Amino acid sequence: MLELHQFRHSPYCLKVRMALAAKKLEYRTVEITPAIGQIDIFQKTGQKKLPVLFDNETIIHDSSSIIRHLEKIEIEPKLIPEGLKEACQVQIIENWADTTLAKSIKIVFLEELTKLSLIHI
């Protein structure tokens, strides 16, 4: 069975969970505590960042690499177009979402979290 090591609130882990759901693949999650839990995953995989997918003896890290792996093990529905032009367009949008958009969301999220924590003091 597929095993997704994740931090639930990570947008990259959410991206993988959405791909797994779209493919209707069975999997189990292993919640990793930021910082402390990452030591354990680093010792197992050599990777510091999440998500990490275990597919039997195969270890895949990075949300985009995991999705490419899922495309190989479950063909339908396709998450990445077959045509070169369309696949490149998807990759450009994905790279933008993973970098520029994710950083912006993180800034807003942290600002809102700070406001909430100040309200409860």
Positions of PLM-derived features:
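GST-like domain detector, emphasizing the conserved glutathione-binding G-site
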Residues: 1-119
